[in-house]
Amino acid sequence: MTQTIFVLNGPNLNMLGKREPGIYGGKTLKDIEADCKVAGRELGFDIDFRQSNHEGTLVDWFHEADEKAVGVAFNAGAYTHTSVALHDAIRAISIPVVELHISNVHAREEFRHKSMIAPACKGVICGFGPHSYILALHALKNITA
C-alpha cells in the first residue's frame, strides 16, 4: 500500500502565476501540484494536494492528515507569521510536518522573518522557488523511511 503525503497550501497561493511573478515565479499552483504528483510517484507516495484561504479548513486538514498520511508538506503563506491555531494543529498531530516557502522569507520584509509554525515543524525549506515543494517531499521521504 502506497503511503500518502498531504501537501497543504494556505491563503493566496491559488494566485500563483498571477501574483508577484518576480517573487513567486510564473508557475501556477496546478503546475506545482502536477510536479508534486510526479515527484511523489518517484518517491513512492500518493500526494493529496490542497489549498484553502481559510485557517479553520487548514486546521481540519491537519487533523485529517494525522489519520490518513505519513507526513505533511505545508506552505502556510501569510499564516506563517500569524497563526497560533496552525502552530497548535501541527503540535496536536503525530506525523512530521515540513514548512516550505517558494521565496526566501528571510530576504524579504522584516515581518516575514518570524514563523509562528516553524517551532512545531520538523524542518523548514525556503527560497528555492517551486522546487521547495519537491525538496519538502524528499525531506519527508527521508524522515518517514
UniProtKB/Swiss-Prot annotation:
Binding site for substrate: N75, H81, D88, I102, S103, R112
Pathway in which this enzyme or protein is active: Metabolic intermediate biosynthesis; chorismate biosynthesis; chorismate from D-erythrose 4-phosphate and phosphoenolpyruvate: step 3/7
UniProt feature coiled coil, ranges: none
Superkingdom in the source lineage: Bacteria
Record-annotated active site: Y24, H101
Database matches in Pfam families: DHquinase_II
InterPro entries registered for this protein in UniProt: DHquinase_II (IPR001874), DHquinase_II_CS (IPR018509), DHquinase_II_sf (IPR036441)
Keyword Phosphoprotein attributed: no
EC number: 4.2.1.10
Catalysis performed (reactions): 3-dehydroquinate = 3-dehydroshikimate + H2O
GO MF terms, alphabetically ordered: 3-dehydroquinate dehydratase activity
Top EC class of this enzyme: lyase
Site (Transition state stabilizer): R19
Keywords (A to Z) from UniProt: Amino-acid biosynthesis, Aromatic amino acid biosynthesis, Lyase
One GO BP annotation of this record: amino acid biosynthetic process
Role played: Catalyzes a trans-dehydration via an enolate intermediate.
Subunit record text: Homododecamer.
Family: Belongs to the type-II 3-dehydroquinase family.
Identification of the protein by name: 3-dehydroquinate dehydratase
Organism: Rhizobium etli (strain CIAT 652)
